[in-house]
Amino acid sequence: MTHPLQLGFQDATSPIMEELLHFHDHTLMIVFLISSLVLYIITLMLTTKLTHTSTMDAQEVETVWTILPAIILILIALPSLRILYMMDEINNPLLTVKTMGHQWYWSYEYTDYEDLNFDSYMVPTTDLKPGELRLLEVDNRVVLPMEVPIRMLISSEDVLHSWAVPSLGLKTDAIPGRLNQTTLTSTRPGLYYGQCSEICGSNHSFMPIVLELVPLKYFEDWSVSMT
């Protein structure tokens, strides 16, 4: 969950986000080790009493600093490609939801149901109830079942938007005339907040996304009440 003055990532709520957090830690450790080594070498170069330190010519050293970066890049690229393919793979989704971006709200359509669609607008600050989040609450939440694969189809009716929910590791561009897709699977129930992450006009900051992940039985009851 998120909290005020948070500096790190939100807690992972999907297998993809857990993989992304592990990859971030893996890459950050490599960057930290490289930075420490470079700073150590610079310090030695500045403090050594030896002369002609800038005219060294050693074939072995040049070979090492050519091969070593290639190995490091491979160690970063392989897990990155694995996650990339995992994010692109969608196997037998239980539910498909079509999302359309507008200036400046989202509309949703549950394509597996005959007449289940709605628009989702931000709740103005003056209408917020105690405990609700400013600029993040909507009048119609996207209710989805947890622990099942869900396919999101994302597009736009006017300008570029981006449908992003950080705790689920989701960020997909909404492009006019193009239908993008992504998959989500939540491992726990709750409310998950996101926002449009592509500058789309004067009210870009007022396009929140709220997903309400519930057990399958509650989702079925909700879908019946909405149709």
Curated annotation (Swiss-Prot):
CC per GO annotation: mitochondrial inner membrane; respiratory chain complex IV
Cofactor: binding comment: Binds a dinuclear copper A center per subunit.
GO molecular function, one term: copper ion binding
All ranges on the Mitochondrial intermembrane side of the membrane: 1-14, 88-227
Keywords carried by this UniProt record: Copper, Electron transport, Magnesium, Membrane, Metal-binding, Mitochondrion, Mitochondrion inner membrane, Phosphoprotein, Respiratory chain, Translocase, Transmembrane, Transmembrane helix, Transport
Catalyses which reaction(s): 4 Fe(II)-[cytochrome c] + O2 + 8 H(+)(in) = 4 Fe(III)-[cytochrome c] + 2 H2O + 4 H(+)(out)
Metal-binding among keywords: yes
Chain positions recorded as Mg(2+) binding sites: E198
A biological process from GO: ATP synthesis coupled electron transport
CDD domains: CcO_II_C
Binding annotation for Cu cation A1: H161, C196, C200, M207
UniProt-listed Pfam families: COX2, COX2_TM
Residue sites binding Cu cation A2 per the record: C196, E198, C200, H204
InterPro entries: CcO_II (IPR045187), CcO_II-like_C (IPR002429), CcO_II_C (IPR034210), Copper_CuA (IPR001505), Cupredoxin (IPR008972), Cyt_c_oxidase_su2 (IPR014222), Cyt_c_oxidase_su2_TM_dom (IPR011759), Cyt_c_oxidase_su2_TM_sf (IPR036257)
Summary of subunit composition and partner proteins: Component of the cytochrome c oxidase (complex IV, CIV), a multisubunit enzyme composed of 14 subunits. The complex is composed of a catalytic core of 3 subunits MT-CO1, MT-CO2 and MT-CO3, encoded in the mitochondrial DNA, and 11 supernumerary subunits COX4I, COX5A, COX5B, COX6A, COX6B, COX6C, COX7A, COX7B, COX7C, COX8 and NDUFA4, which are encoded in the nuclear genome.
Role summary: Component of the cytochrome c oxidase, the last enzyme in the mitochondrial electron transport chain which drives oxidative phosphorylation. The respiratory chain contains 3 multisubunit complexes succinate dehydrogenase (complex II, CII), ubiquinol-cytochrome c oxidoreductase (cytochrome b-c1 complex, complex III, CIII) and cytochrome c oxidase (complex IV, CIV), that cooperate to transfer electrons derived from NADH and succinate to molecular oxygen, creating an electrochemical gradient over the inner membrane that drives transmembrane transport and the ATP synthase.
Name the UniProt record assigns to this protein: Cytochrome c oxidase subunit 2
Gene label: MT-CO2
